[in-house]
Amino acid sequence: MALQFQLNQTTPQTVTTDCVIVGIYADKTLSPTAKTLDAASGGRITALTARGDLTGKSGTSALLHDLNGVTAPRVLVVGLGEADKFGAGQYIKAVGDAVRALKDAPVTHALLTLSELPVKDRNAAWNIHQAVIAADHAAYRYTATLGTSRKKAEESGLITLAIHGQETSGLTLGQAIAEGVEYARALGNLPPNICTPAYLAETTAHFAATHPGATCEILDESNMEALGMGALLAVARGSANRPHLIVLKWNGGGDARPYVLVGKGITFDTGGVNLKTQGGIEEMKYDMCGGAAVIGTFVAAVKVRLPLNLIVIVPAVENAIDGNAYRPSDVITSMSGKTIEVGNTDAEGRLILCDALTYAERFKPEALIDVATLTGACMIALGRAATGLMTHHDDLANELLTAGEHVHDRAWRLPLWDEYQNLLDSTFADVYNIGGRWGGAITAGCFLSRFTEGQRWAHLDIAGSASNEGKRGMATGRPVGLLTQWLVDRC
């Protein structure tokens, strides 16, 4: 259940709400509203601070009850950490900490006043839209496949978060991005027996059909065969769940050239003949998170009605294994006409993407971005904090990096030097689909670059940033924030 958001300018000590959220720094300095409530309550917050109950350390919080002079029955005091280090990341964490602290409290409506805090190089509108994104992310609960009683328990709690401020533009953008992120997370978290290629196609088609200005075209196997998508169809051969190519369009920019996003949509990746093993295969439902992210970005763009043209392409495929599955040493012909020698069937993402990228050329993109959980090598290099970015275009790299920094959905650029290209040489085809042990994220990007010649193109490898690790890990919805901000910056 998504949070509901509103702006509120009522005096915090008299506002009607279940809880007012304030902050305290590690040096015991109170946020402006905390100072106001402290004065109204006769110094109660200061007294608790002096007693050591409120430390101000990041990650800590305390729920205070029935302060004298304060109408709200509860005040949540959130630790902000060191004041001189309080930046975008610390602000986002504090908002998330506040929402998580209220998870089990009998609070359905709260007023967040952390939006009043000064954040370096940010303004009031940013504070509000980032608070919306962070709060919605923290409040997210997966319930799609839970039983009735557990689903009811998970859906209880905070319903409405009022944010202190008046920047309506920040609220509108924040809600759009939050909805796009949540849409992507919901798709990514579904089990693969539900989120099949057909389900992904049906879900996105329904969204487009219910939002004026958006359209959706679904290409089936026969359409792809007619187009010569031999690489994509080779990956799909081993699965009973047939492939679909999803093409979403938002026409908000008249006759202008469109921005095109392509997202890897492997709804489950067994590895194929090069079968994955336990310790990795159980998380392969997340291999469609690139597709989910570009769909989520489309949702955000439609919700905020961006004045540009946007096309989203998702090759939705399951990489499974049967007697008809493609094999190592097969040579397949891509839509571009280039032949590809298969060195490993678990390097399937680049095969479905190369045909989707070739298909994208027909739209004459202003810029072409692909998003994929493409390589474990990228996760080894960058961990889960940063998305890997590769492009030959410095201006495009700077645009994407700047957008990511602005919304704290950050990326890090990796090289696409010519010296890596010869690692993809093949004796039997135009290109080999793997590049050896070293620089795997880069050679995967180099492979895709061979199918984007002449395009203003960038590749985002989200293998690390798309999901959290472990039994309780979930899809993150990244990089919906980065991509949406990048599109907003183009308007």
From Swiss-Prot:
Protein location: Cytoplasm
Entry keywords, A to Z: Aminopeptidase, Cytoplasm, Hydrolase, Manganese, Metal-binding, Protease
InterPro entries, alphabetized: Leucine_aapep/pepB, Macro_dom-like, Peptidase_M17_C, Peptidase_M17_leu_NH2_pept, Peptidase_M17_N
Record bears the keyword Hydrolase: yes
KW Hydrolase (keyword) present: yes
Catalytic activity line of the entry: Release of an N-terminal amino acid, Xaa-|-Yaa-, in which Xaa is preferably Leu, but may be other amino acids including Pro although not Arg or Lys, and Yaa may be Pro. Amino acid amides and methyl esters are also readily hydrolyzed, but rates on arylamides are exceedingly low; Release of an N-terminal amino acid, preferentially leucine, but not glutamic or aspartic acids
Gene3D superfamilies per the UniProt record, alphabetical: Leucine Aminopeptidase, subunit E, domain 1, Zn peptidases
Primary subcellular site in the record, as a coarse category: cytoplasm
Annotated binding of Mn(2+) 1, by residue: D269, D346, E348
Cofactor: Mn(2+)
One GO MF term: metalloaminopeptidase activity
Binding-site positions, Mn(2+) 2: K264, D269, D287, E348
GO biological process, one term: proteolysis
EC number per UniProt: 3.4.11.1, 3.4.11.10
Residues at the catalytic site: K276, R350
Class of enzymatic activity (EC top level): hydrolase
One GO CC term, this protein: cytoplasm
Disulfide bridge partners, by residue number: none
Comment on bound cofactor: Binds 2 manganese ions per subunit.
A Pfam match: Peptidase_M17_N
Function of the molecule: Presumably involved in the processing and regular turnover of intracellular proteins. Catalyzes the removal of unsubstituted N-terminal amino acids from various peptides.
Database matches in PANTHER family: CYTOSOL AMINOPEPTIDASE (PTHR11963:SF23), LEUCINE AMINOPEPTIDASE-RELATED (PTHR11963)
Family, per entry: Belongs to the peptidase M17 family.
Protein name: Probable cytosol aminopeptidase
Protein species of origin: Xylella fastidiosa (strain M12)
